[in-house]
């Protein structure tokens, strides 16, 4: 007979076991055993109820919002959040069939936002994303918005609209907007910035969202002030109407401003941007893809900032006749970098050697191989400390560090708005393997932090970090022993750390500055327009998936 802890562990892993063995422990005089047995039994019953709720929704063709909300609540409670997105998208699709367009797209936005926020499986499936795009396109066609003017305007300066889901001083989009505003060629282009405010609570909403963001006027106050100084117009959708009214307002504003090229820095979680991407609001439309594309048929080009995702998707876009590009998002060396934080404020001794890694998906990049290597390093160097910076639950990694006896020397800083300045507190940057977040590597290099990277393979996601850091900071092949030796050498030798850090900064200045990113984006806008307006063949985009910027 299985022990209580074995049964509880199986239930926690999501197994649907027979609850009969738990009944023995439910009558135990030991209060702890009684609690665990009843809790495990209740989780089994809830999972069964969850399955019945799915069948209930299917029986009524996903038409009852109250039942859907009950299903969502149970999904969250039993830890099966991955299963909530599909039924919610089906609910939205059925609402669209009933011509309840606002309810439909807001339900779909809720589902996609949650899935992306929790790195769910639904949006990792391209077929699901195409289904979502199809629903947005149905609404865009049914609403009946049309451009009362011809979009074939011709200006001396090419007018570029940067459309984002929200302005924030502490995220990558906000930093990119600020960098573009400082570095774009104002003699050839005119830049306008638009925020859909899709995540902000509106006065009229048909379907509540999971969470609501702060309006850009508050969250992006510094960015808006900077744009005003740079004479870049910023416009935000009004919040006094519902989602469809906001989409129409944005479309009307884009037409009034006679925009030539729109850069949508958005995902499918932005229903307002998805509708505008389908309407004739500009001469050309480009999706800047950080995570997943918008998959809208109204786009002329998908521009990736992640080379691995670009390589995975390029054949798909080629088959659909859509241009796809990869552009490196460099580091803005003109951006004001905050001073290094005081170590004592974080309980870190001044004599400690601080190692760090940064990323937007640490659960994925902090692999078992990397954690085992890190444990070896921490055991060999008692004065060393490791600091995780970025997003991720890291529950499995925390258990691994605790069981290895180094848990007290591993810190978790979470998502920081003061990057890359926060990385100055570290002495050494460790690029995770097999894959890492290349943005973290570049940020560390920009503040003169020495980097150690491993080229795990030739795939872009396994070699991006080493490609940025260069051969001087790279371990060739899957050699954890050499990686540990290199890190140990840098821990022991402050002079070597300082020298390598300077060379990292020089490498960024020479090859990975944001100035190059700006020039490539300007080039992309010109090529897209020339391709649409019949420019000369040598200037047109003739190869659908050719990267504009290669990593040296």
Segments from the language model and where they lie:
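N-terminal subdomain of nucleotide-sugar transferases
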Residues: 2-29, 35-40, 50, 57-58, ...
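Short acidic alpha-helix that forms the nucleotide-activated donor recognition element
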Residues: 251-252, 256, 415-426, 442, ...
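A charged, aromatic-enriched C-terminal amphipathic alpha-helix characteristic of glycosyltransferases
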Residues: 341, 492-530
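Catalytic binding pocket for nucleotide-activated donors in carbohydrate/polymer assembly enzymes
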Residues: 432-494, 498, 507
């Amino acid at each position: 007979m299985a022990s209580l802890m074995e049964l509880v562990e199986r239930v926690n892993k999501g197994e649907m076991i027979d609850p009969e063995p738990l009944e023995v422990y439910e009558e135990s005089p030991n209060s702890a055993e009684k609690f665990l047995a009843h809790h495990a039994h209740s989780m089994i019953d809830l999972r069964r109820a969850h399955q019945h709720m799915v069948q209930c929704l299917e029986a009524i063709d996903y038409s009852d919002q109250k039942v859907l909300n009950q299903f969502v609540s149970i999904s969250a409670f039993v830890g099966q959040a991955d299963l909530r997105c599909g039924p919610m998208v089906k609910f939205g699709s059925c609402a669209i069939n009933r011509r309840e367009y606002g309810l439909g797209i807001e339900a779909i936005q809720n589902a996609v936002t949650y899935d992306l926020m929790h790195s769910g499986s639904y949006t990792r499936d391209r077929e699901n994303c195409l289904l979502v795009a199809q629903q947005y396109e149905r609404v865009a066609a049914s609403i009946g918005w049309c451009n009362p003017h011809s979009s074939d305007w011709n200006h001396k300066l090419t007018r570029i609209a940067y459309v984002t889901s929200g302005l924030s001083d502490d995220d990558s989009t906000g930093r990119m907007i600020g960098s573009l505003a400082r570095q774009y060629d104002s003699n050839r282009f005119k830049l306008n910035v638009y925020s859909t405010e899709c995540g902000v609570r509106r006065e009229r909403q048909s379907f509540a969202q999971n969470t609501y963001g702060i309006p850009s006027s508050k969250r992006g106050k510094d960015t808006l002030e900077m744009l005003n100084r740079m004479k870049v117009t910023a416009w935000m959708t009004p919040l006094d109407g519902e989602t469809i009214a906001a989409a129409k307002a944005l479309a009307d504003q884009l037409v009034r401003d006679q925009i030539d090229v729109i850069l949508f820095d958005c995902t499918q979680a932005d229903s307002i941007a998805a509708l505008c991407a389908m309407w004739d609001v500009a001469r050309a439309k480009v999706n800047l893809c950080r995570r997943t594309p918008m998959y809208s048929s109204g786009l002329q080009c998908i521009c990736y900032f992640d080379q691995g995702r670009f390589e995975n998707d390029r054949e798909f876009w080629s088959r659909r006749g859509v241009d796809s590009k990869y552009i490196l998002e460099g580091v803005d060396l003109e951006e004001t970098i905050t001073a290094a934080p005081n170590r004592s404020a974080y309980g870190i001794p001044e004599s400690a050697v601080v190692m760090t890694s940064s990323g937007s998906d640490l659960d994925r990049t902090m692999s078992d191989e990397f954690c085992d290597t890190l444990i070896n390093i921490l055991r060999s160097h008692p004065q060393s400390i490791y600091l995780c910076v970025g997003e991720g639950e890291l529950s499995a990694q925390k258990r691994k560090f605790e069981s290895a006896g180094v848990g007290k020397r591993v810190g978790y800083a979470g998502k920081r708005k003061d990057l890359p300045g926060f990385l100055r507190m570290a002495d050494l940057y460790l690029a995770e393997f097999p894959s890492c977040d290349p943005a973290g590597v570049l940020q560390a290099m920009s503040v003169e932090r020495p980097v150690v990277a491993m080229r795990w393979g030739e795939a872009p996601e396994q070699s991006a970090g080493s490609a940025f850091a260069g051969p001087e900071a790279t371990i060739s092949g899957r050699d954890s022993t050499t990686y540990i030796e290199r890190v140990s050498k840098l821990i022991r030798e402050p002079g070597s750390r300082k020298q390598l850090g300077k060379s990292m900064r020089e490498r960024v200045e020479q090859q990975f500055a944001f100035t190059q990113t700006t020039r490539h984006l300007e080039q992309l806008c010109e090529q897209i327009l020339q391709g649409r307006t019949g420019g000369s063949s040598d200037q047109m985009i003739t190869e659908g998936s050719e990267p504009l910027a290669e990593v040296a």
